[in-house]
C-alpha cells in the first residue's frame, strides 16, 4: 500500500484541529481505531471524545508505516492510467517540478483520498466523461457544513466510483454531494477502515487479479 502526498507533511487538515486549537473530535463508534493504534482520547461528553490532533496524525502515521505502508511525499498525481475502461494506475510527478515528463505507476486499485477537491474523480470525469457511479454520472460537489449528516454519509459514500477507483474521506462526500463536517474525524477514520476492508476482501477473492 502506497500513499503519494503532494505536500511535505502528511495528514491533511487534521494537524490544525478546529481552527488551530489542536483538538479533534471523534465519536464512540470510531474510538476503537485510535485505541488500537495507541492514540490517547478523553471523553468530552457521552458519545464524543477529544484527541490531540498532533498525536493523532503522528500516531496513525507511525503505526501505519510500522505495518508496511509506504509514503512518498512531495509527489503530485497529475493523471490516471486507464486500461480497458478501468483505472490501472496513476501518473505522478514531483510537486515542486511539474515541467518534466512524469512517471506511471501501475496498481490493482487506486483510492482517491485527495479531500475536498476529489482530484482523481474529476480527472476521470474530464478524461472519460460522466461515467461515475453517482446520480448525475459526474462529481456532485461538496455541500455546506452539516457535521451530523456528513459524518454518516461519508461512510456510506465510501465506495468504488469507477472500475478500479475508490473514494474515501472528504473526497467521498465531495463526489456524492455530501456536506463537509469541520474538525470531527470519526467518520474519516471509519471511511478509511471501510475502504481498506472492501479492497482487502476483493484482493483475497482474486477479483482484482
Question: Where is each model-derived feature located?
Answer:
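Core catalytic machinery and nucleic-acid-binding channels of phosphodiester-processing enzymes
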Residues: 33
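Residues forming the flavin
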Residues: 1-29, 37-45, 49-209
Amino acid at each position: 500500500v502506497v500513499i503519494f502526498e503532494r505536500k511535505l507533511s502528511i495528514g491533511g487538515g487534521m494537524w490544525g484541529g478546529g481552527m488551530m486549537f489542536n483538538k479533534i473530535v471523534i465519536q464512540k463508534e470510531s474510538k476503537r481505531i485510535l485505541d488500537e493504534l495507541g492514540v490517547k482520547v478523553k471523553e468530552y461528553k457521552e458519545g464524543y471524545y477529544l484527541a490531540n490532533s498532533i498525536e493523532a496524525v503522528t500516531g496513525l502515521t507511525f503505526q501505519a508505516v510500522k505495518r508496511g505502508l509506504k509514503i512518498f511525499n512531495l509527489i503530485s498525481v497529475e493523471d490516471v492510467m486507464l486500461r480497458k475502461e478501468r483505472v490501472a494506475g496513476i501518473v505522478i510527478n514531483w510537486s515542486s517540478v511539474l515541467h518534466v515528463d512524469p512517471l506511471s505507476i501501475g496498481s490493482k486499485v487506486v483510492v482517491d483520498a485527495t479531500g475536498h477537491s476529489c482530484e482523481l474523480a474529476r480527472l476521470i470525469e474530464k478524461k472519460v466523461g460522466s461515467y461515475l457511479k453517482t446520480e448525475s454520472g459526474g462529481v456532485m460537489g461538496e455541500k455546506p457544513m452539516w457535521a451530523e449528516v456528513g459524518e454518516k454519509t461519508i461512510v456510506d459514500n465510501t465506495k468504488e466510483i469507477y472500475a478500479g477507483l475508490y473514494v474515501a474521506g472528504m473526497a467521498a462526500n465531495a463526489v456524492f454531494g455530501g456536506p463537509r463536517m469541520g474538525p470531527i474525524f470519526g467518520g474519516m477514520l471509519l471511511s478509511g477502515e471501510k475502504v481498506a476492508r472492501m479492497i482487502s476482501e476483493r484482493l483475497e477473492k482474486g477479483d482484482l487479479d
